[in-house]
A protein has these predicted regions:
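Short inter-helical turns and helix N-cap capping residues of alpha-solenoid HEAT/ARM repeat scaffolds
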Residues: 83-84, 115-116, 146-147
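Extended, low-complexity, charged intrinsically disordered regions
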Residues: 2-15
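Structural detector for internal amphipathic alpha-helices that build alpha-solenoid repeat scaffolds
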Residues: 40-43, 53-67, 77, 86-100, ...
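Residues at alpha-helix boundaries and short interhelical turns
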Residues: 46-49, 82, 114
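Amphipathic alpha-helical scaffolding segments comprising HEAT/armadillo-like alpha-solenoid repeats
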Residues: 33-35, 64-79, 100-113, 132-144, ...
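Long, contiguous interaction/recruitment modules in multidomain scaffold/adaptor proteins
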Residues: 13-69
C-alpha cells in the first residue's frame, strides 16, 4: 500500500511533538544594567530583587555590580563575554583583587558556566579568597566539575572559607593551662 502525501500527516510521526527549539548556549549574556547573579546558585535575576527567586538567598547586603562603578561593570562584562579565555581569566583575577562582595555573583556565574577550565579554576580561587559564606554552596557544586583542577581549587576555596569563618577555640592546651573565663 502506497502512502499519498496529499492525505494528511504521516501516521508514523508524533503530531504532538513540536520541533524542539535550539537549546540556549551554555553562556548566555548577562546584562549587568538590568540583572544580577545570585552568589549562591549562579542564576541571573532582576537587579531589583533582594532575594533570589531560585534559592531564596537574601541579597540585600550585596550591591549589584550594575549599580557600581563603570570599571567593575566593564571588567565583569569582559570576564563573562570575551572570546579569549586568557582575557576572561585575567579579568576575573583583577575583579578578585578588588575584594568586594558585589563580584560574588559574577564569579559564581563564571565558575558554573564558563567552558574553559582555567577560567573556572580562577573563579573558584577568587571565591575562596573572598571568604564569603554564600560561596560555600557554589564551591560544593564545583566539586562535581568535570575538570580535576577546578575540583581541586574548589576544595582549596572551601578550606579558605572554613578557616576564615571558623570561631577560634578559647580553651586551648592542657587542662591546667586553660584560662578560666568564669572569674
Amino acid at each position: 500500500m502506497r502512502k499519498n502525501k496529499n492525505f494528511g500527516p504521516d501516521p508514523n510521526l508524533n503530531p504532538y511533538k513540536a520541533k524542539q527549539p535550539t537549546p540556549p548556549s551554555s553562556r548566555s549574556f548577562i546584562d549587568f544594567n538590568t540583572q544580577r547573579v545570585c552568589p549562591s546558585c549562579g542564576k541571573a535575576i532582576k537587579i531589583t530583587y533582594n532575594f533570589c527567586k531560585f534559592c531564596g538567598v537574601d541579597l540585600s547586603s550585596i550591591e549589584p555590580i550594575g549599580n557600581s562603578d563603570e570599571i567593575s561593570k566593564q571588567l565583569a562584562i569582559t570576564a563573562a563575554t570575551d572570546p579569549d579565555p586568557g582575557v576572561r581569566k585575567e579579568a576575573i583575577d583583577t575583579l578578585g583583587e578588588f575584594g568586594e562582595k558585589k563580584i560574588l555573583g559574577v564569579l559564581t556565574y563564571l565558575l558554573l558556566n564558563d567552558p574553559d577550565e582555567n577560567v573556572r579554576k580562577e573563579a573558584a580561587d577568587e571565591l575562596g579568597d573572598l571568604h564569603h559564606p554564600y560561596s560555600m554552596e557554589v564551591l560544593a557544586k564545583a566539586l562535581k566539575d568535570e575538570s580535576p583542577i577546578v575540583r581541586k581549587e574548589a576544595i582549596e576555596g572551601l578550606k579558605k572559607i572554613k578557616r576564615k569563618t571558623k570561631p577560634e577555640k578559647l580553651d586551648k592546651g592542657k587542662p591546667k593551662e586553660r584560662v578560666d573565663h568564669e572569674e
